[in-house]
Amino acid sequence: MVTIEMENGKRIEIELSGSAPNTAANFKSLVSKGYYDGLIFHRVISGFMIQGGCPRGTGTGGPGYSIKGEFKAGGVDNPISHERGVISMARSSDPDSAGSQFFIVHADAKFLDGQYAAFGRVVSGMETVDEIAAVNTDSSDRPKTPQVMKKVTLSEDEEVTEPEKVK
């Protein structure tokens, strides 16, 4: 279980899936190192998704490496559908370009199935996702009021391993 504690004290709890094991390992590894602490949800589109995990806060940064895309177009059978509450990895047009940026689906987006590595779902705190999705944004979908992830933590029973990196 991963808990995202927002700056306002509200929480989002995410249960990770075994359907994208390297993607989940990557996320847990970054969480265990405090990578996401203090980062923002830099791209928010109500009725679609909220995206965070960029160290620059712009959507252009990452951890300095990428992982293989664990989804059908990347040659991996991943049965998780991009339904409301699912967490998935953001990437560029390169299927193997995911690093640290992730998104939480705000409303069903099944057109993403097979193209992005879904690796878990929100089990508590969808009202917090809804609140983030409702904030005012600029023309680049950036919240006018920063939506800060104060601390992102793993439950004690989560095993952490380093992910397999491709670049």
Residue ranges and their predicted role:
Residues 1-167:
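Cyclophilin-like peptidyl-prolyl cis-trans isomerases
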